[in-house]
Amino acid sequence: MLDLPNTSIIDGNAVRWGRIGCGPPLVAIHGTPFSSQVWRRIVPEFVDRRTVYYFDLVGYGLSEMRAGQDVSLGVQNKVLAALFAEWGLERPDVLAHDFGGATALRAYYLNGLRYASLTIFDAVALSPWGSPFVQHVRHHEAAFAGMPDYMHTALLQAYLQTAAHRPVSDEVLQMYAAPWTGPVGQAAFYRQIAQMDQRFTDEVEALYGQMDCPVTVLWGLNDQWIPFAQGEALAKLISDRPVIPVSQSGHLVQEDRPEVLVAAVLKAINNR
């Protein structure tokens, strides 16, 4: 497990983060409904050559969760920009997944953040997105938030399992589910789904173009959440190279094929 011993207060939200390794900076940004623990088998591989920063998005993992909180994509890029400023980063390497990918792109095009390289995979970046489950929860947040614990836990773990191509162990499922359980966590889980809004990617999608850093786009061939075709389209917009298909992998490449991500980041940082 990765340790997140630090807390930063950003726009009234407590954001938990950690840092390991030494060398130039690398920032890892997780997606939904996960936490920075998705990087536990990946970022330790870079500690001999990079100082790796990782954090839990606002409303996720160990970061603060509370009623009435804005945890949408509309705030996450602002949080990333604030963390860059606090950490004193100018052009770090960036590794981003899912909502983390959307956050990295929004921060680049809207907040002016710049990266030494961007490795982005299975990202929420192009419309349409949002599964039928997401659309249903958006319209019935209160009903889902009030479900009995055992029903919520069963639904949550079943949902998490669909992110991976290979069976995820009970231990790993429990790790990912833990922040979303209990009175605070259960409400927070449905809150973040209810706030999923395509307008936050629509407003930046028109700005997509070749970025001023090397961009590597990877995508799980078996991603049931965001189809591979979106990875192909995204690569054409922001990179000078085609998408890299990841075989035997679903949306959660960190669990299915972590070695592919390690290799991609090493290639990106070694080629500069």
Where are these regions (language model features)?
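Catalytic active-site module of serine/aspartate enzymes centered on a nucleophile-bearing elbow/loop
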Residues: R241-R272
